[in-house]
């Protein structure tokens, strides 16, 4: 047998065939196969690999047995693999169930523990954040609307809000706001927010502007929170005021003041608080009011100036009453000083906290007398049956506030999943469009005039830091003033000048130097003069005086053209009290620097008369009289000579025009009618004391205007104003007169007057009389006015009276008389009115010293009767005669 086993593989096939034929050897062969299967397989593989040794294929029966054996082995291996997999799955399922049960048991234990701890008043013991987070995740997975989860979310909300409020500062407020909106449901926790921020503000008053700014930002998105905070603060202020709790009242008032500055609360509430505190002043109430006013004073000065002035008047009254302590009185004085400085140390809103646009802010109108609901129930936990819906609603609101957009995230993920080429193309496109988009975003339109404010600040600091005007001009010329803003430099110089307590020549010399350096500065200052004259009524007296003296210096030094005075219209309609004071101070400054004589000569410049028509009007007698009175009252009557001459000649021109119109009619009736018209138009009611006027009629002679002067030679004008009453006065006589006067140097003048005077019998309705008187004289005068003739003029006059009168019997009488007129006496016509001497002394306040010896030659004619008459000549004194008086 061993030899058979060592036989070569080539004889195996033969022996197997022989064994098949001989049955006794079959068992031995099978035993051999079982003991060495590997060898048989290797022999088969060897025979298959080397066909040269054995070229005949194996028998069919052998192949069948081998394939069936292989099938049985593979089926057994598959069954064992499936069994192993099933066993593994069952084991994993058991482990997972065990873990789930363990987690549920732990969660139930934690929930029970949390419920027991949270049942206490203090809110329970400290739970580590990791454990609390796991607990909340477990509760949310189990039931998001459960009471346990709502309680845990409420505690987390309270801790989040309190932590963020305590952490906020000027430096990190911009990062705290997104966390506040994103990490907490402020709509649900608005009561917690108000309570936390009120507590934090009461403990740290210096952070009140920060808390107010944070509330202002929240109020723009969630106005209900700002309103609730304002309501609670007002309620707390009322309670503390009634309880005399000074600390709480002071902190609450300060918080409300900053909310008013941020426009969260209307300024009416601030005024009501001030009125309440100052209604019955005590040391504590006045102290709180002073602190409140320092915080809100800058805002009230801009928004409610009238109410602010009334509050300071009340402060002043409290100070003068003296019912408060010295310390509080000193606080009021310090507050007044702070107000004069413009609240520099207490601005409305610090620059770092000015984070809300004025148009975006929502202002709440709350009064101290309103019925307020502070909603204390929002401070404690309550189960919300719609908790899940409210949370989803707040998520959408948070997305709108913070700008979160799921589409953008989706777009970003899709962009990441794109192919390399498409991503490269899109990146190229974005790179090409990026700078343009950035440039469009950077186009900012500054409508706050920040650059203009900075320019003014620079000019102001430059002026104030200069030792003399030359240094200031040199520094200002180095400034890069933008094109078109040269006027701002001039305005700032004038404003700085007006801010001084008294006028300083520093600013006048500065303006003069600018004007003489370049023509554009002269034109700019001229434009500035026009602007300031139009708005001078807005300035108080001290500032007005400084501005007037500044421009007076510029005019007196010829820095700006005198034609700029064309904006001044000196009449009653176009001037105000401020503008008249401005012109007065400006002209007095010019007079002080130039002198009265030089000033008068400058105003006689012919080329500028057109520009001074508004200053010295000659188009309307009323405006002329107003200008004369004004300049005479300020001591510059010498400037009004031409206007006075105009007033003298104006009636003559008017009378000549009327006479030319009446001469066209050419009839006696028209003459008689026109005489009445002319007498009424020229004003026959005279109350003057001039010796050149006739008491029976108004004669517009050369002495018609009454001057308040002392002497013609000295040209010194008194302060007595021009009397328009004396100019437009009328005689009270009943005679109707028509007069023409002509006066020439060393020539003869004749005056003709017609008068009808009823006799005594005519008054009783019994008789009528007509009289006519003729008189003529010749006089010599030095000037063109009879009222300004020499006091020693030589005059010879003859008076001829020719009258026709109707006697009671129906006959006519005629008389003619000649009588010399006494020297140095002016003719005076009598009428039936009262004694003219008494009336003259009573009605005529202004007496002219211009007139010397005055004479008048009057001729009076009356139409003769149609019937016959008797001619008689006699020296008699009739009512229509005009005797002379001294």
From Swiss-Prot:
Residues 38-55, 672-730, 771-790, 802-820, 843-853 have a biased composition (Low complexity). PROSITE patterns: MI. Residues 731-755, 791-801, 821-831, 873-886 have a biased composition (Basic residues). One of its GO terms (cellular component) is catalytic step 2 spliceosome. It is found in: Cytoplasm; Nucleus. GO terms for biological process: mRNA splicing, via spliceosome. Residues 1-90, 400-445, 664-886 are annotated as: Disordered. Gene3D superfamilies: 1.25.40.180. Residues 454-570 form the MI domain. Keywords: Cytoplasm, mRNA processing, mRNA splicing, Nucleus, Spliceosome. GO terms for molecular function: RNA binding. The keyword Cytoplasm applies. Residues 158-342 form the MIF4G domain. The keyword Cytoplasm applies. Belongs to the CWC22 family. Involved in pre-mRNA splicing. This is Pre-mRNA-splicing factor CWC22. It comes from Mycosarcoma maydis (Corn smut fungus). The lineage of its organism: Eukaryota, Fungi, Dikarya, Basidiomycota, Ustilaginomycotina. The gene is CWC22.
